[in-house]
Design a protein with these regions (language model features):
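Gly/Ala-rich beta-loop-alpha elbow adjacent to hydrolase catalytic centers
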Residues: 95, 99, 103
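Catalytic active-site module of serine/aspartate enzymes centered on a nucleophile-bearing elbow/loop
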Residues: 236-268
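Conserved alpha/beta-hydrolase catalytic His-Asp/Glu region
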Residues: 129-135, 147-206
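Flexible "cap/lid" loop of the alpha/beta hydrolase fold
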Residues: 104, 108, 114-148
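Conserved serine/cysteine hydrolase catalytic core
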Residues: 187-232, 241
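Conserved acidic catalytic loop of the alpha/beta-hydrolase fold
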Residues: 74-91
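Conserved HGGG/HGGXW glycine-rich cap/lid loop of the alpha/beta-hydrolase fold
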Residues: 10-65
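Alpha/beta-hydrolase fold catalytic core
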Residues: 1-25, 47-50, 88-89, 116, ...
Length: 268
């Protein structure tokens, strides 16, 4: 990993693979996940001629872990610091889970000047269910808005049980280094609440670059309908649902995910 310093002095980390002159593809992992979780995507993207960057923003992976001050706005600013420090142009931003909504935070603050396309991996832009958005986190609505994630991410009873996922589980455990530390610090709980209560639909509607929304058909967290509904919010949106796939769509079914991502990147 290579380090760089954010504008407030916090250390961020990233790795580079592939052709330094290739089109930049920036991979952003989700909540509690590290840059290493993209291990199944890096070789495929690098082999296709891209400059591949996997990033650990503050509080994740090998980056510095401040006890406080990490929210979605700060994550968007961290991403800006990375893109600016490396002077990336026409970058494809790919975000899994919270990494996806981090992209909307970045775009809402800094615009599209450095970005040519966006791919969101199994992340609804609005986790709170409402009359106009039934594609949020299962059983999460105004009635439990401030309590549902008070102790972490609750089980939903949806998706394929881990014991029945076979090789999908093996890939998941490999990419996530055995599952990682599931305990949450007060700072992480604050970030999770900020993530859960945000609504990024206006940011999507303001986007003019191509956006691909990918859903796992068997996601543990939300119905796969979020992908098509999100794509409908932006003029250059498209969506895909991967069969027999969970929330970690790029990890559980990497061949199908990589095939679709590479085909889409080649078109946009």
């Amino acid at each position: 990993m290579t380090s760089l310093t954010a504008d407030d002095g916090v250390r961020l980390d990233y790795t580079e693979h592939g052709d330094p002159a290739g089109r930049p593809v920036v991979l952003l992992a989700g909540f509690k996940a590290s840059a290493a979780s993209w291990l199944y995507q890096v070789p495929a993207l690098a082999s296709a001629g891209h400059r591949v960057l996997t990033v650990d923003l503050r509080g994740h992976g090998l980056a510095e872990r401040p006890a406080t001050g990490v929210d979605m706005a700060r994550r968007g600013q961290d991403l800006a610091n990375v893109l600016d420090a490396l002077d990336l142009r026409a970058a494809v931003l790919v975000g899994g889970s919270m990494g996806g909504n981090t992209i909307w935070s970045y775009l809402s603050q800094h615009g599209e000047d450095r970005v040519s396309a966006v791919a969101i991996v199994d992340q609804t832009p609005k986790m709170l269910n409402s009359a106009d958005w039934p594609h949020g986190f299962y059983s999460y609505d105004d009635a439990n808005r401030d309590t549902h994630f008070a102790e972490g991410i609750p089980a939903t009873g949806h998706g394929t049980p881990l014991a029945r996922r076979g090789m999908r589980l093996v890939r998941l455990l490999t990419a996530m280094k055995g599952g990682g530390d599931r305990t949450l610090t007060p700072g992480e709980l604050t970030l999770l609440h900020d993530h859960a209560t945000a609504d990024w639909r206006p940011a999507i509607a303001a986007t003019t670059v191509p956006v691909l929304f990918v859903a796992g058909a068997e996601s543990e967290f939300w119905p796969s309908t979020h992908a098509a509904a999100s794509a409908a919010l932006t003029p250059r949106g498209s969506s895909a649902v991967i069969r027999k796939d969970g929330h970690a769509a790029n990890i559980e079914q990497p061949k199908a995910f990589n095939r679709g991502l590479l085909e889409w990147v080649g078109r946009v």
